[in-house]
Amino acid sequence: MNSRGPLISSAQVKAADALAHERFGIATDWLMEAAGWQLARFCNGGTVVACGVGNNAGDGLAAARHLLRWGRLASVACVDAGRLHGPAEKELQALRKLGVDVTGTLLFEGAEVVLDAIFGTGISRAPEGNFAAWIEAINSSGARVVSVDVPSGLDSDTGVAYAPSVQAHTTVTLGLPKAGLTSADGPRLAGEVWVADIGMPFEVYAELGIVVPPTLFSAQDRFRI
């Protein structure tokens, strides 16, 4: 446990999401919406949102909708939008209904910030193909990089960086800090690490044996570690 709350593993993240829905009626859609709001607050400039194909992408797409409203959205790209499903696919459709063109080409025109929503806590091997190419492009973009949960390419449990991995300036980790952010390559790649509240009930964590201080977010809904 660090000074501001326990660390959480990728397996516990998955279990918490399932338990929140099945036991407590907290839909993944709601958590994704809260995540998007928090992420957008860290993007202070024209933002390119780079999405993968999982729930991490959904968080990025939700953030894009807020950035659009705030006049800070430069563009949105998804490695393979056809693979999105569930809440992430709903976020994609919402953006398209608002007239946002979600392309399969990552462009950095007008980019002051890149929101890295390519990989989240589930990665277990080195990125390949377009995933790897996009990570390398982000690192070469010259823009400030904000990563969702962990920098893409970083193992969220061990902190070991696969090649390639995103070099973030800021990492916004959702709910609780991920174990890999504090070990091995994690501190080097993550930049500033902020923990952001997305509304996950502490009772969910308690069911998994994770003790969260009840005052974790009492002073503010995000904090730096």
Task: For the regions a language model picked out, list residue spans one by one.
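An N-terminal, well-structured beta->alpha segment
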Residues: 1-49, 225
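Generic, low-specificity signal for short hydrophobic/alpha-helical stretches with a mild N-terminal bias
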Residues: 2, 13-17, 21, 49, ...
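YjeF_N-associated NAD(P)HX repair module
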Residues: 2-11, 113-225
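Conserved active-site and cofactor/substrate-binding residues in soluble primary-metabolism enzymes
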Residues: 8-11, 26, 30-38, 55-58, ...
